[in-house]
Amino acid sequence: MRGEDSDLCFDCLDQRINSDFSDQIVFSYGVSDSPLPFGSSAVVKVSDSSEEFSASCSSCESTSSQFILEYLRKDEHGCLAKYVDKFVVKDREGNSNDAVESDECLDCSTSGSQATEDDDTENITCGSVTCEHSGSFSCWRTVAALLPIAQIRKCSASELQKLASSFHYECPEDQILASLHRLIDGKSSGQATHSFLCLLLGLPLLEEKSKLRCLRHPNLSPVLGLLTSSDCLVSVLPKAPYTLENILYYSPSAIKSEWHRNFIIYQLLSALAHLHGLKVSHGDIRPSNILLSDSLWSWLTIYSKPDLGSVDANSSASRRRWCVEGCYSYGLYADLKISSHLDWQTHFDKWWKGELSNFEYLLVLNKLAGRRWGDHTFHPVMPWVIDFSKKPENDSDSGWRDLRKSKWRLAKGDEQLDFTYSTFEFPHHVSDECLSELAVCSYKARRLPLSVLRKAVRSVYEPNEYPSDMQRLYDWTPDECIPEFYCDPRIFCSLHPSMSDLAVPPWASSPDEFIRLHRDALESPHVSSLIHHWIDITFGYKMSGHAAITAKNVMLSSSEPTVPRSVGRRQLFFRPHPVRLGFSREKEQSRNELEMHTFHGFGVDNKRSVILLADEYLEETEEASAFSDHATHLCPKYHLRENLVESPLHVSYSENTKKVNTSLPGTSKNKGLSSRISLNYLLEHMEVRDEASTELQELLQWRQDFCTGNISKDIAGDIFSIGCVLAELYLMKPLFNSVSLATYLEGGDLPELIKELPPPTQVIVEACIEQDWRRRPSAKSLLDSPYFSATVRSAHLFAAPLQLLAKGQTRLCYAASFAKQGVLKVMGTFVAEMCAVYCLPLVTTPLSEDECELAYVLLKEFTKSLTPMAVQRLVLPSIQKILLTTGYSHLKVSLLQDSFVRELWNQIGKRVYLEMIHPLVISNLYNSPDKISASAASVLLIGSSEELGAPVTVHQTILPLISYFGKGICTDGIDVLVRIGRLLGVNFIVKQMLPLLEHVVCFCIDLSSMKKPEPVHSWCSLALSDCLITLDGLVALISDELLIHELTKGRLCLHVRVLMQKNLELRVLQFAATSLMSICQRIGQEMTALHVLPQLKELFDEFAFSEKSTDASDSLSWKIRTAEQKFHPESPIKSRMDLVLLLYPSFASLLGMEKLRQGCPTWLLLEQYLLKHHNWKWEYTGRSSRYNMEARPVLKQGPASKHTPKVLLNGSGRSVPQSQGLRNSNHLKLHIHVPVEGQEAVLNPLVHEPWSWFPSPVTCWDGLDIGRFGNPKDENRWKIRASVLSSARAHHGALRSLVVSEDECTVFTSGIDPGFKGSVQKWELASLSCVSSYHAHEEVVNDIGILSSTGKVASCDGTIHVWNSQTGKLISLFSESPSDQDQASSDPSSKNNSNPCNRHASHGLSSGIFDENLYTCMHYLEYMDQLIVGTGFGALRFIDLARGQKLELWGGEAIESGFTSLVSALCSGGSQTKHGDGASVSPSWIAAGFSSGQCRLFDLRENGFISSWRAHDGYVTKLVAPESHLLVSSSLDKTLRIWDLRKSWTPQPFVVKGHNDGVSGFSIWGKDVISISRNNIGIFSLAKSQDEEEQQQQRIIPQKLYMAEKGGRVKSDLSTICVLPFSRLFIVGAHDGHLRICC
């Protein structure tokens, strides 16, 4: 740790950076270990407007332009300074100091510089008499090994910008990864690759006498450069987003598991093994020095201390010597007594005794909470102690701010905070930050650059909007104060001419006086007697638990606790903070002392100390001591020495140095040393075999056997620090504090906390912190210990190369090539999942064609290698981003191929595909999509429609595409609709598609006749065009007989209805006329005259009588035009009257003039008009007239396709459908699909088509959706008609349970069969027929569940049968024995589980369960592949399905009578919950309902009991968790109840009544809940239960189910219900054994 005396104040540091680098380098904030704004490091932003730099930033993993500059005084870093000066001299002599560009230059003769032939780096030393480096590891050689990529440059802005550009664009370690990629591909690789792999594997170099390779270990922070000035060196490092300290303080859940903890430690040990191999100790390992990336990859920092070899390292230079002369900040903080060398306990004791001011103590607390000076997002916070209403006086409460309440509470009021807490989704009173960036920048507005104000406050700078005086500033914000208002008068003075100075209160004459009075107020007796309350609210126990609720201080919690955070609120204390000694108001009043005197200085008033009673003083002392002992975690210790002044370059030899091999240490457990590391060698090291958890005995044997005596005391100190960090990762608090460390060193007594560690971790930690440093293991020995599993080693070896500073393309090549060689399969699914976070971000960046192929390979390999849940959580978000890209993307087209999608289906199932991918496939067919992407998407949709089934296809493909009519749907989108019609058959076209299209046409016609804005009318015309094109394509597929039948249904021909409209665009009318003639020619002369011509009479009459209004000049122009050019029916018409020219001559040719004149009374007027304007005259020649307007569509000629869409989709190639024509704004060409070769042009209707029972959804479809602009994914509420579409007799007795497969094509039912035995039947919904049965049950089956996409089914009849639904063979059988009940007593949730059960707690749904040892219900945990089953004695049994064995038993629920009740319902929270990206998350809790009406909540992750409450007055029939915080329950007490678990673990329900009988079950679709009671169904909305909090009840209106065809009611009682969300259907089972499909 750098001493404060060698630090700059942040003002001087800012000025120094500006002086060295100009204003192109923006100072963000300083970095310091001190509570005061002094330090030698700063976070800066490097600005560069060059296009190359901007483009490079976008292609790099880290797009941030922030870097850390650390100033190192040359007189404190002598070795490093001489090393740098050597290359500065060489640079002057003409030698290049650019970064290396080839493997052959990667040696330690230069720090990234090419060596000259006469360099003798083996014997180079720095020349310092005190330098202890010697031998093969010389001082300069060690520096080069630690800084292999650092470029040495002059200190200037341009050089720093070059370093930044090199980091983002040139990527100095790209060559190493490229060489490794060549090795994986079986090509020749350089020596650097071998050296790098030896570095990771811990192997010695092949030639020990060769020059040491200059390679950075991936877990050491990269020093990009060393910039030199006259007196300083400036090291340049990329800024890491987090430190381990950040994670432990603000987002501990980001370290998700024990594996992640061990992985972090393994990385640190790997870096230490490299350092120790160089005979270098780190010396300062602590969480704040461990940097983490977004993916939690670790970097260990180096070079943060002066070295021992410098002549002035031990001299004490004053702070004034390095700051500028007359530094203002030095005067501000000169009298403060705090120091970074003192721990919290010392500062607390000084403050409590009055030796430290309130201001100083609060600064210490800010530092402990992680707050940073100058960082506007996380600035130190101070309390407002006065309200500025008047000048405060010590003898009055007037003018003082109430420190017992938060500023947020004072500003908002209790009523508003109570409302916020009770109504918001995440209950809270206050924000998650007591001092926002907006408030800080507003406070400091006079001193900050305008660019900062525009970014943080408002983009448009308005100086008058900023508070002008302190009173307004205080009233304006609910945030707390900043330290500057207590110490720095400059904050009032404006640097901006347009903004006035901040006015001080009237009782202060100047800013200086205000600062003095404000500071005095902070130190006054009034504040000293109350400041502990503010500490409790801001840093203490009132931040959580019941105390936070009482104080109205519940903070807004993070919605994603597993996401790493670098800022947040840290709770320092967990019990009330003691009042300052002598300032207790209660004791002051009890003693009846004199009124308070004015407080002088920072000490305690002598008069007050005299009158303190001895017992009261002792009581306060004991209270403070107990508080201090309880907060020892604020004094962490990670080292055995207090003052660490040695350099990391300090040589660390053991007593047996001469006996130690100076090369990098090898390992005894390596699988042999290969003379050449090959791909097979790497795969062998990465292979993960099935292994059990670490055995404690094996670890104990390792500790006894590991080699000792080859490490130095300094290196052993690093191992001690590693042990402390490992323990803290598990304990979430430091292992040692100052007291416990002293006790341990003195007597060897280990801290009590160590007993809380898992036994294997405890063994490792005890070995690392061994009191005798000679007995501590080396880093290499720890890496090879059995503590680290093969999964950790494999993941590190695979991921480490990806952390090199290489280009995204190179990293992608490495990952894809390695994955293609089978590394993911070799590593196993778990390691592949852990490594996905390092690989998948590479595929979502802009890629070239070649890179797209690599990205496709990588996605495909991860899809095959990961578990379904992992694919859903990790791979699908990347696929979603790719499918959402606009324009052409080679990768997107690849992902839309059938081979990939089917593989995805097999992994994640169709339900997840339909939720997360299918809507994005459809989105590629509208809004001017790329033609190739649209073609690929259309082929995919066509081929998937048959497998998805008619109901899903209609609701998830056809309706969304129709909703895009008029909104930019492309030709391929319409082609999808037509080809799906061809694929699913003529009955599907007639029954499903034609009614939908008719609905669209009628809706558009009705809308066009209304007075609407122009965009609406324009949309109507576009939608009609799309609809008519689709209609024509479908009509071409049906027979003439069916076509005539559709025309003779009594409905007006749609085309004629369109032609009758006067508000539609002419191109729509022209297309309708052309289409109508095509239909007429198909049905023939007689049918046209019989059915079509009468409907045209009104239209012809309109044309005849409107001819007189035609303008004469217009007629003349028409005559001239028609005389010069013959009119063609495809030529765009100019007016509505031109339809006469399209229709009348064509009908004359088709019907003959005589029949036409008979059907058209106004024939004379029309023929006169045609003769006059178009020179048309009927001439009978036995054939058609010379102006025969034949409207038959011209079929697109070309080679016929040899494959049906199904074959096209299933192929491995990337076939796309041929275009069926183009549409544009001026001309609409009719699209009729050419029949596939070998098939008939028209489809013949089948008698027994699949899904024949499925009705048209048009009756449930809201036409208004068509005109609404928005995402069709945002569906409206389901309109349930309570109509039975089809039914079948499934069982002889009652149908007890049913479950539907995720593709909604198969349903399993269980019920009572003859002999009161149970059976399970498998039904295909397409034909509504039973295809197989399972009859191995001896009792009635009460519950069934589909376990996975592999076809396994579990069924419960008191025992659990797991069987294969394809073969019907039993896989596993599980049952409970009486002896198993004794296990439940060990469950943490059970107090007494040995009581007899209630054998009569059964009801109609569970008849047959009379034995307490029988299983009653079950719930599948997909994430864990486990089954939770309830028992008759109220316990929960876990079953591992993969291993086929029973796991733990959680105890049952005891009721007042001493009996237990059976478990009647189970569910888990989280498994159905989705992230914002749609990915499922693992369940975090389990809810169990009981026959007694009780409900219990269990913590699934911690294996503990959470809560229990009386949920119902009767048997709980079902539990469902629609969201992570919601629980819905039903009961035989006739109610359903909704429980919001966020507000309390014993929540108040939202009660839903209305049923007259017990609710036997329910099912949820979206926000709608469909419940069943007897023979009634009831519907209510979850949205109302959340939006209308004041309404405590919602009533259900029961409905009867009606038979769709017969119209009669369903009289049988309903027993179970299941919703088919994608099909918009639901299925009910009844006591009469029937299975009924309803809508």
From Swiss-Prot:
Domain Protein kinase: 206-294, 715-788
GO cellular component assignments: Cul4-RING E3 ubiquitin ligase complex
EC category name: transferase
Location of region: Disordered: 1377-1399
Name of a matching Pfam family: WD40
A single MF term (Gene Ontology): protein kinase activity
Low complexity composition-biased segments: 1377-1398
Subunit structure: Interacts (via protein kinase 2 domain) with BCHC1 (via PH-BEACH domain).
Family: Belongs to the protein kinase superfamily. Tyr protein kinase family.
Protein name (record): Protein GFS12
This protein's encoding gene: GFS12
